[in-house]
Amino acid sequence: MAETVLAVQDLKKSYGDFQAVRGVSFAVKHGEVFGILGPNGAGKTSTLEMIEGLRDITEGTVVLNGLNVAKSAAAVKKIIGVQLQASAFFPNLSLVELLRLFRDLYGAESDPMELLREVSLEEKASAQVKELSGGQKQRFSIAAALVNDPVVLFLDEPTTGLDPQARRNLWDLVQQIRAKGTTIVLTTHYMEEAEVLCHRVAIMDEGKIISMDTPDNLKKALIGRGFKPHRQVVPATLEDVFIDLTGKELRD
């Protein structure tokens, strides 16, 4: 059985009198893709930022690869990958220059051009982030997050704002990263995204985890409670039609 790489115990976050995260607990195994699902305001991002050491923990503990995040935040940041927003990158540097900069900051040995090839951006090596499309920016931010060969890769709403083609292209990229054995923790409010990418999901609402299991087991439990779909289930969706008509090749 794979070892636990991330253990979250009774995690809480308060902003004044408002309790955004209310006693969240879960564990993630090495090589697992773990998804945190929930509507806006459920506490997903606050939970992720506390785990990453980017936000103070009000109560509870987070242990990542044997390190207590509250006590060793600097050490934790060296072994994780965090997907940055496009605005976080130096605007006047090219993609390959940015990756070299991040590599040197980490003291890593990664090859910037190989990282760009991994995310299908090698032809954009000399471009600046501002010249990229939305899908390309998201893929580059993942390349930057992989520069230190992280123990855990964190993706916060990685496909928000992308069209169906770019979203599915990013899913393909995450699946490629997953196939290499990288542990991934992601947040999303796209149910299909979680179903495609995640080994297990935790469903959050109002700061609490209200259910946690594999996508298949969660669906089986719902059916076991007598659930009847409100509409006929068909083998294709309108999104499938859109992608079929507009092209399945990589488009940004």
What residues fall within each predicted segment?
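Helix-to-loop junction immediately C-terminal to a conserved catalytic motif
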Residues: E52
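Conserved ABC transporter NBD signature motif
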Residues: G60-N68, A75-V76
